[in-house]
């Protein structure tokens, strides 16, 4: 999904920064990739206007099939409704 959008080196650096369990940090990841503005639409695989926790758990695998799935703790949304809207996502990556 990211072919031609991100440089392979940027993807590798971003994935390396969160290889260990419980180490994923949205701000660091998006900063390493350099394209926070385009990610919401890409992660929202079903184009519902929200990122569901299941979509977010498989987020790293969008970059590389061998990447780990994110844990429940790493994908918990702020308001607890199980979905991350655009405003919540922007706040999350800018936090």
Curated annotation (Swiss-Prot):
Residues covered by the EF-hand domain: 39-66, 77-95
Coiled coil regions in record: none
Other observations noted: Is regarded as an important allergen.
Keyword Transferase on entry: no
Keywords per UniProt: Acetylation, Allergen, Calcium, Metal-binding, Muscle protein, Repeat
List of residues binding Ca(2+) 1: 44, 46, 48, 50, 52, 55
Record-listed N-acetylalanine modification sites: 1
Organism, scientific name: Merluccius paradoxus
Protein name per Swiss-Prot or TrEMBL: Parvalbumin beta 3
One term under GO cellular component: cytoplasm
Entry's transmembrane regions: none
InterPro entries named in the record: EF-hand-dom_pair, EF_Hand_1_Ca_BS, EF_hand_dom, Parvalbumin
Function text: In muscle, parvalbumin is thought to be involved in relaxation after contraction. It binds two calcium ions.
Chain residues that bind Ca(2+) 2: 77, 79, 81, 83, 88
Lineage: Eukaryota, Metazoa, Chordata, Craniata, Vertebrata
Family statement: Belongs to the parvalbumin family.
Gene Ontology terms for molecular function: calcium ion binding
